[in-house]
Each structure stands twice: as C-alpha cells, then as structure tokens.
A protein has these predicted regions:
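Terminal low-complexity tails and localization/encapsulation signals of metabolic enzymes
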Residues: 1-78, 82-85, 89-108, 115-116, ...
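Active-site proximal loops enriched in glycine and acidic residues that flank catalytic Cys/His/Asp
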Residues: 54-56, 65-69, 115-121, 129-132, ...
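Generic, well-ordered alpha-helical scaffold segments in large soluble proteins
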Residues: 76-86, 101-105, 109-112, 116-120, ...
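Conserved small-residue-rich beta-alpha loop and adjacent elements
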Residues: 148-214, 288
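A structured beta-alpha segment of the ubiquitous adenosine-cofactor-binding alpha/beta core
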Residues: 151, 218-241
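Structural signal for hydrophobic
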Residues: 161, 185, 217, 237-240, ...
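Beta-loop-alpha module in the N-terminal Rossmann-like domain of NAD(P)-dependent dehydrogenases
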Residues: 161, 168, 224-230, 246-249
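ALDH superfamily catalytic-core signature
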Residues: 209-211, 233-234, 239, 246-327
Length: 327
C-alpha cells in the first residue's frame, strides 16, 4: 500500500497560523535558479539574471534565474550519457528508495514549497497544498509501481529523456514526469516552463539530496525556442515527455519523427495538451450546487488547467434557471 501525502487543514487555526508565519518569514526571500548539471556548469554573469515576478503582484520580485546557454545544454547531454549505464544498472529498489526519500523531503518542507508556489505561480493556499501533495504522491506512486513489478519483469530504459513541464503545475507535473522516467532507469534533463524555474530548482535539489546522482537528473531553465529546441533535436535525447500547448506538441512530434533510436525504433513522445472538458447535468441535480461546481471548475486557477470546465450540458427543463443563476 502507498500512504497518501500529508496536507493542511485550512479550517484549523493552528496549522493556518503556522503557515502564515512561514509566509511572513519568506515574504521577501529571493530564490535563485540556474542550470543544475552533472558536470560543473559554465559561469553565468549575474548581471544577466532574469527576474521572476509574482503574477498576482508584478512589482514583487520572487527570485532570479540564469537561463541555460548552448554550452550548458551540451554539458548536460554529456553528463547524462555518461550516467546512463550506471543508473540503468542500479537496482530498482534503490531507484524507488531515492524517489521515496525525495517525497519525504518535499513533505517535510511543504510550507516553504507552498509559499514559493503562491509567490511564483500565483497559487492560493488550497491549490498550493494540493500541488505539493500531488508531487509527493507522484514520487511515491512510481516508486511503488516499480517495486511491485514481478521479479522477472524486464524494464529496459530508453537512455536520456527530456521532460518539458508547464507553468500551471510547476511542481506536480514536473515531479511526475521526472519520477516516471527516473524509476524506469532513464536519465532526465528537465526543462521547466520559463515562468516557473524557481520551484523546479528546489525539486531537483531535493532529488539530489535524496540520492539521485547529479548526472542522472539535471535542470536546464530557459526558453522553449532555444533550450527546448536544442535538446529536442539532439540525437542523444531518446524520449520526450511534454505537457503544454497543442502547437508545441506538434512541433515536437515533427522533430522526433525525423530520427530513430540507435536500435531503429521511433523516439517516444508522450504529450499532454489542452483538454475539452464537459459537465453533464441531469434534471435531478441541485441547481445551486451545479452553479458553484461549474464556476469553480471553469475559473479556478483562472481557468488555466487542462481539467478546467469548457462545456456545460444541462437539461432543457432546468437550463433557463441555471443560466440565470450563473449570470
């Protein structure tokens, strides 16, 4: 059995007060992000660091990021290729243990991670709690999956996998992609969304602290059209996991379709793009509850999530009343 992650009861004054205390301590904290590589990275001019601001308060600087250079990309690829064989040969129990330790670290630092999520990506407390918990659950889920495989099951790693994650769930989806690739014996180069590199740096540092070798998981913050394009076109990338727009997914699809793996197989692309989600309401539903659920689903996180409500289907007998209440 896999234990569920711990959370916060925001209706309880005591944990809420503790969270507010942490938030006040970190209110003016400036986080930093830069390439995190298996080899020593190139020296970055701090004067070129890019400010990351709070999307809910643009005047508030949350941190700074030094985006990866072309040289950083090459160093990361070289380090990953060198680490491929040893990580693939690492026992699955040890790979799973690394993920579980990383989950424990995230859970222990949930308050700090929540505050950073609120400041860097505009999360509410409730959404920040849910995001950290989802990241923890992803790590433990994939660890448990590999542990429960039959002893004679063969899991053949691809090699080095590129993980490109979105800004709307910059810790949960970021961690889920990486966890799935790592536990299967792959090395990972993670390219976070350019808007949210700070939380990504924290996650990679926790994975390192949990025992994942530096060359096995690396971080390359930067733009999709530069860092992402250079990585996706490189023959050393043997798989891509992407969450984002359909437009970019199609570009990646065309890119990987131009080449094959060393053994002649297509390069896997796992792409999660936008959703078209419907809520179907029958005539027995409580109209007041439907309105609350529809508004929350459509507009929570400003509607910027793949699971957000797009289409509301209602029974003709109740449509007029429901639409009036929605308005």
């Amino acid at each position: 059995l896999r234990p569920n992650s711990n959370g916060f009861d925001l209706n309880n004054d005591q944990p809420l007060a503790a969270l507010d205390t942490t938030a006040q301590k970190l209110r003016s904290h400036i986080w930093k992000s830069a390439p995190l590589l298996g080899f020593e990275s190139t020296v970055h001019d701090q004067s070129n660091a890019i400010a990351i601001t709070n999307p809910a308060q643009n005047s508030e600087i949350v941190g700074h990021v030094n985006e990866a250079t072309s040289a950083d990309v090459q160093l990361a690829l070289e380090a990953a290729v060198q680490a491929e064989q040893s990580w693939a040969a690492t026992d699955k129990v040890e790979r799973a243990a690394c993920l579980k330790r990383a989950a424990d670290l995230m859970e222990a630092r949930i308050q700090e991670l929540m505050v950073l999520l609120c400041r860097e990506s505009g999360k509410t407390y409730a959404n920040a709690i849910a995001e950290v918990r989802e990241a923890v659950d992803f790590l433990r889920y994939y660890a448990t999956q590999i542990e429960n495989l039959p002893a004679n099951a063969q899991v053949k790693p691809l090699g080095t996998v590129l993980c490109i994650s979105p800004w709307n769930f910059p810790l949960a989806i970021f961690s889920g992609q990486i966890a799935a690739a790592l536990v299967s014996g792959n090395c990972v180069i993670a390219k976070p969304a350019e808007q949210t590199p700070l939380i990504a740096a924290q996650a990679v540092q926790m994975l390192w602290e949990a025992g994942v070798p530096h060359g096995v998981v690396q971080l390359l913050p930067g733009r999709g059209e530069t860092v992402g394009a250079q990585l996706s076109q490189d023959d050393r990338i043997q798989g891509i996991m992407f969450t984002g727009s359909t437009e970019v997914a199609k570009i990646l699809q065309k890119t990987v379709a131009k080449r094959l793996s060393p053994n002649g197989q297509p390069i896997p692309l796992i792409a999660e793009t936008c959703g078209q989600n419907a809520m179907i309401v029958d005539s027995s539903a409580l109209t007041e509850q439907v309105v609350i659920d529809a508004v929350n689903s459509a507009f929570d996180s400003a509607g910027q999530r793949c699971s957000a409500l797009r289409v509301l289907c209602v029974h003709e007998d109740t449509a007029a009343t429901l639409i009036k209440m929605l308005k």
